[in-house]
Amino acid sequence: MKFSESWLREWVNPAVTTDELTHQITMAGLEVDDVLPVAGTFNGVKVGHVVECGQHPDADKLRVTKVDVGEEELLDIVCGAANCRQGLKVAVATVGAVLPGDFKIKKAKLRGQPSHGMLCSFTELGIDVESDGIMELAIDAPIGMDFRDFLALNDVTVDVDLTSNRADCFSIRGMAREVGVLNRADVTEPSVAPVAPSIDDTVAIEVKAPAACPRYLGRVVKNVNVQAKTPLWMQEKLRRCGIRSIDPVVDITNFVLLEQGQPMHAFDLAKIDGGIVVRLAEQGEKITLLDGSEAELNADTLVVADHNKALAIAGIFGGEESGVTSETKDVLLECAFFAPDHIRGRARSYGLHTDSSMRFERGVDYALQVSAMERATALLVEICGGEVAPVVAVESEAELPKPNKVALRRTKLDNLLGHHIADSDVVEILERLGMTVETTAEGWVAVAPTWRFDIAIEQDLVEEVGRIYGYDNIPNQNPAAALKMHDHQEANIPLKRVRDLLVDRGYHEAITYSFVEPEQQKLVVPGVDALILPNPISAEMSAMRLGLIQGLLNTVVHNQKRQQPRVRLFEYGLRFIPCDTAENGMRQEPMLAGVIAGTRSEEHWNIDTNTVDFFDLKGDVEAILELSANDKAYSFVAAKHPALHPGQSAAIVVDGKEIGVIGTVHPELERKFGLNGRTIVFEIEWSAINRKVIPEAVALSKFPANRRDIAVVVDEAVASGDIVNACLEVGGEFLKAAKLFDVYVGKGVEEGKKSLAIALTLQSNERTLEDADIAGAVDAIVTHVSEKFGASLRD
């Protein structure tokens, strides 16, 4: 939003400098981006009157003039502008004047004729106006007046970067209100008296979309002189706000837009067939806009139409067929309130961005239309003449916005600002902002004014009080905080510890969606009905996940399609199990899952890049379980899972309870997911592994340990873990460890059998073991595994 400081001060004139004013505005939350002078630096330029104007005797394109600048003698000035003529009021740079660029005016002769000054154009005075020739001033411009004073050029343009919630400040009226509140200064608005109708001509108006257009005003003005010249004061105000002058009718609607904040539009009455209809467009309906472009409209776009065609995209852009031209005699002024929700996004969809759409999208004061119509009518009659008809208004009271009523608690205000502001100051600030305030036991209830769409919740009122009171006036205070030692159970295993462990082993953490494709999930977890979302993001994300494996497998596929030969991922997250007895009919259980695929290690010239297998992942899972410091509590038991290979899957058991699964993905599932090669996964209940046994210090034995190796032959179906556990069961007090170190199948071992080599470590804390002690323990172990598993010692 650009505005002229001098125009603002016509409304409110606080006793502050320009710098102080812009600082106030910025600190109030309306950030000032730039402050620029409205004209170049010059002096010695006066308002003059061309008394005589004749052709130069020796140059076809030059004219010899005599100009009155209020001095005793007329000035002889040679001018080359085509529009120079007798009777014109002009800007005259007298001898001694200094123009922008340090250009000094001196006495001179042009083709033999004396020239004691220069008739100036806008450009020569550093004024950004596109025009041909010299400036043409109003006929009543006072001769001899300093030109800077005449046009109030000791002024600046202030460019404010407004946030989307402050649509009320997209006008001089809005900025003046804000400055008045900040300085406790009265705002003087221009008097807008109703223009009495002089004719009875009206246009029928029908609003077919009242929710999108709750209020529509139309007024006919006949016999308008569109050839009239826009007054220089209006041109200047428009220019300083970044809008160029076009013609008096358009200039007036733009002026009201900038002054009042109300977008308006003018139609050529002769081009309207039947009457005005405000409706939604038909899908594919076309309209040629004022800039010559053609728009194909969507069915959700509001248009202003007559009985045969669309005349304008409502609140966004006018149509070429109904636009005002130099031939226009009669106009229809439009002034409406279009609901923001029905304008927002429409301009962008057609590649448009206008001053009108910018305001309507954010919200225009819905009580402004009547006064804006009267203001525009008065200016139109003053500048262009014309005969005025009555205003025709169509209004849907039920669809107009209702003022927001918001409660503000004293405690909330103090808590958020960290400072106590007196009750009287709070009430004064809110009332100066245009709110109606009622005091309650807990604080206040404020009714937002019609121009403040952004006042909706308690925090909005806190912000308003804080910024008007002044954040600089709130003293700095050190935060008051107490350091508290939080309880932490030593037995808990932090999730970060597990994350660090897996990252150290080459994994990357993944976060997958909790919403999954239901049919695909049935392949991974058949027989369990997932919770289906009533309003899913998409059909592919319509079920709550029953586990983490599905998301990880899809992530593996995603990476493999991007030429990643080695994938190692893990995820911590919730699974959602339907349960009638649980809160909201669903149990939310934290799970830890992982997946590996591709090569065992990164490609290296000195390392074989073998493909991963079941035991690679099993080792990583064992590392997680070993964090519990109780390696005797867990085991892997062969088990079937519908998503896993029947011969390469196991249940993870801790203290006799199944807490998870591990295995190679079933070949059929690999095919349906699109996996490339062998993929191994695991999934564990986090609550079953997040506690550890607190280790106890024990004395180390000072006596030597003894190792005995045995090789037992058992059926291939017997798990090696069961053999190891059987050894520990009967090994007695001297057996400290039993570990599998070799598995052999082949020559010398009967088909269907396998040889398991187990290292037995025996030691006493009290004495050196004798051969009889060791032999007794070994014999007991061999006898036990022989009886339990039919094992025999290998020769």
Swiss-Prot record:
CDD domains associated with the record: PheRS_beta_core, tRNA_bind_bactPheRS
Quaternary structure annotation from Swiss-Prot or TrEMBL: Tetramer of two alpha and two beta subunits.
Name of the molecule in the record: Phenylalanine--tRNA ligase beta subunit
Cofactor(s) needed by this chain: Mg(2+)
Domain B5: 401-476
UniProt organism field: Vibrio vulnificus (strain CMCP6)
Subcellular locations according to the entry: Cytoplasm
Stretch forming the signal peptide: none
